[in-house]
Amino acid sequence: MATINQLVRKPRAKQVVKSNVPALEACPQKRGVCTRVYTTTPKKPNSALRKVCRVRLTNGFEVTSYIGGEGHNLQEHSVVLIRGGRVKDLPGVRYHTVRGALDCAGVNNRKQGRSKYGVKRPKS
């Protein structure tokens, strides 16, 4: 336990909280341009070809973003919206692309969980 005198000389340091998504700069989403669209493999024990893209954001950051859902229409120079949220089995991927916003189309033939994949309500 520190004495009063010690605390007067050197107060207790506030704990600094480190952001999991520094490139967003405290914004909910950010816009960016795809510089590379490719697939990568996850860590053990999983196995797949995960779709990801490198995105140059409007604030100058370049980040790797995951493209969720089955199939996508992204290519180089596509303008995308990115949100936070890491992909546990892809090291270094801390962002998700928002489906159905800007140049990124929603997922085709999606009936459930539509809001997460940018799909309008089907006509029925």
Curated annotation (Swiss-Prot):
This is Small ribosomal subunit protein uS12. Part of the 30S ribosomal subunit. Contacts proteins S8 and S17. May interact with IF1 in the 30S initiation complex. InterPro entries: NA-bd_OB-fold, Ribosomal_uS12, Ribosomal_uS12_bac. GO terms for cellular component: small ribosomal subunit. PANTHER family: 30S RIBOSOMAL PROTEIN S12 FAMILY MEMBER. With S4 and S5 plays an important role in translational accuracy. Interacts with and stabilizes bases of the 16S rRNA that are involved in tRNA selection in the A site and with the mRNA backbone. Located at the interface of the 30S and 50S subunits, it traverses the body of the 30S subunit contacting proteins on the other side and probably holding the rRNA structure together. The combined cluster of proteins S8, S12 and S17 appears to hold together the shoulder and platform of the 30S subunit. Belongs to the universal ribosomal protein uS12 family. The gene is rpsL. The keyword Ribosomal protein applies. Pfam families: Ribosom_S12_S23 (PF00164). GO terms for molecular function: rRNA binding; structural constituent of ribosome; tRNA binding. GO terms for biological process: translation. Keywords: Methylation, Ribonucleoprotein, Ribosomal protein, RNA-binding, rRNA-binding, tRNA-binding. The keyword RNA-binding applies. The modification 3-methylthioaspartic acid is found at D89. PROSITE patterns: RIBOSOMAL_S12.
